[in-house]
């Protein structure tokens, strides 16, 4: 409807299917670190209005500077009414890619991300995906967890790669 200024900001955890759907519509997509604060920072830096996180926080700077579920829900309902479509029809252009998230608790004595075995498992997964998927390995900002996220077109392959990386982390943190 011409109201979107610029593009959309998501986090590192945003599904590749969202990025592809927006790109297919000619809408730029940028990724920030995880957290509303980082989404807002990137929105301001780029001069854009709309962003969000997988947690469901949707930020529409033209309405508010924080995530507001009521405002986001009302905007979706308005679009549905204007188009005369149900939610499923409105979302037909987006197909989420298979995504696996494994959380691994660890003690803070050493950094598992610095391990050669973990780096080797990451490199192997990236080679298997060959540009058709991605791996994200990050520490939680709120608890002693490592998050292994894998996504790509082949669900079995995505799960296998995530589990291999998780196993390498468990081996060095045991």
Please name every model-derived segment.
Residues 2-174:
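Phosphate-binding and adjacent anionic-ligand microenvironments
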């Amino acid at each position: 409807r011409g109201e979107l200024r610029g593009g959309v900001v998501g986090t590192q955890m945003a599904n590749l299917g969202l990025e592809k759907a927006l790109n297919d519509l000619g809408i730029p997509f940028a990724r920030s670190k995880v957290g509303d604060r980082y989404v807002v920072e990137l929105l301001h830096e780029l001069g854009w209005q709309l962003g969000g996180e997988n947690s469901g926080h949707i930020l529409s700077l033209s309405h508010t500077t924080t995530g507001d579920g009521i405002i986001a829900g009302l905007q979706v309902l308005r679009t549905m009414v204007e188009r005369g479509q149900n939610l499923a029809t409105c979302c037909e252009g987006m197909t989420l890619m298979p995504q696996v998230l494994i959380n691994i608790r660890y003690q803070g004595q050493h950094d598992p991300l610095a391990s050669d075995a973990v780096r080797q498992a990451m490199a192997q997964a990236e080679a298997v995906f060959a540009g058709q998927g991605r791996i994200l390995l990050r520490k939680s900002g709120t608890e002693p967890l490592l998050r292994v996220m894998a996504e790509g077109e082949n669900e079995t392959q995505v799960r296998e790669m995530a589990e291999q990386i998780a196993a390498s982390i468990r081996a060095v943190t045991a």
